[in-house]
C-alpha cells in the first residue's frame, strides 16, 4: 500500500516563472540575460555551487551596464516564487489520511528559507534539496539520497 508521497516544488507546490522574473527587472537584453542565467547557471545555483554574490558577480561580468538590474534580480527573485495555496493545503488532507509527504527539489538555499517562512513546509515530513547535496534532478543519485535518508521504498 502507498504510504509515502514525494512532491517537487516548482510548478507543483509553488509557481515560478523565469520569464516574468526577467521581464520585471530588465527593460533591455531580456533574452540574453535569461539565457545567461537560466540555461546553465541557475542549475549550478540550485546545486549550491554559487552564492547570491557569485551569481551577481558572474552577471555583472557578462553585462556590466546592467549591474543594478542584476543585483535587484538576485536579491529579490524569491518574491516571484508564489506558493500554490490549494496544492499546499492538499498536503494537510494527505496527512489526515496517514500519508507521509516529502519534497525532492532543485532549489537554492535562500529559496528554502523563504518557503519555510511562507509555511510551505509546515506539513512536510522531510525533504532533499539540491543545494544540500550538490546534485540536481534528474541525477539518479539525488533520488537515492531521498530514499536512503528517509528509508523509503
What is each residue range found by the language model?
Residues 1, 96-99, 150-153:
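Glycine-rich phosphate-binding loop signature in dinucleotide/nucleotide-binding domains
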Residues 1-39, 47, 57:
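Active-site neighborhood of HAD-like aspartate-dependent phosphohydrolases
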Residues 4, 136-153:
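Conserved Lys-Pro-Asp/Glu-containing loop-to-beta segment of HAD-superfamily phosphomonoesterases
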Residues 12-13, 18-20, 107-110, 133-134:
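Short, solvent-exposed loop/turn segments at secondary-structure junctions
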Residues 20-24, 40, 54, 58, ...:
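Alpha-helical elements of Rossmann-like donor-binding domains used by nucleotide-donor carbohydrate transfer enzymes
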Residues 43-73:
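A metal-dependent, Asp-based hydrolase signature
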Residues 53, 71-102, 140:
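Short, acidic loop-to-helix structural element flanking the phosphoryl-transfer center
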Residues 86-132:
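Substrate-recognition/cap helix-loop segment adjacent to the acidic, metal-dependent catalytic center
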Amino acid at each position: 500500500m502507498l504510504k509515502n508521497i514525494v512532491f517537487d516544488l516548482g510548478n507543483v507546490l509553488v509557481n515560478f516563472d523565469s520569464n516574468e522574473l526577467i521581464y520585471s527587472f530588465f527593460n533591455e537584453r531580456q533574452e540574453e540575460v535569461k539565457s545567461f542565467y537560466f540555461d546553465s547557471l541557475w542549475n549550478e545555483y540550485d546545486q549550491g555551487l554559487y552564492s547570491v554574490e557569485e551569481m551577481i558577480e558572474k552577471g555583472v561580468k557578462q553585462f556590466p551596464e546592467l549591474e543594478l538590474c542584476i543585483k535587484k534580480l538576485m536579491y529579490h527573485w524569491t518574491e516571484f516564487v508564489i506558493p500554490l495555496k490549494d496544492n499546499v493545503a492538499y498536503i494537510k488532507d494527505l496527512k489526515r489520511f496517514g500519508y507521509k509527504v516529502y519534497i525532492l527539489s532543485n532549489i537554492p538555499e535562500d529559496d528554502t528559507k523563504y518557503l519555510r517562512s511562507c509555511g510551505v513546509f509546515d506539513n512536510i515530513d522531510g525533504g532533499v534539496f539540491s543545494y544540500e547535496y550538490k546534485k540536481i534532478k534528474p541525477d539518479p543519485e539525488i533520488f537515492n539520497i531521498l530514499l536512503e535518508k528517509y528509508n523509503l521504498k
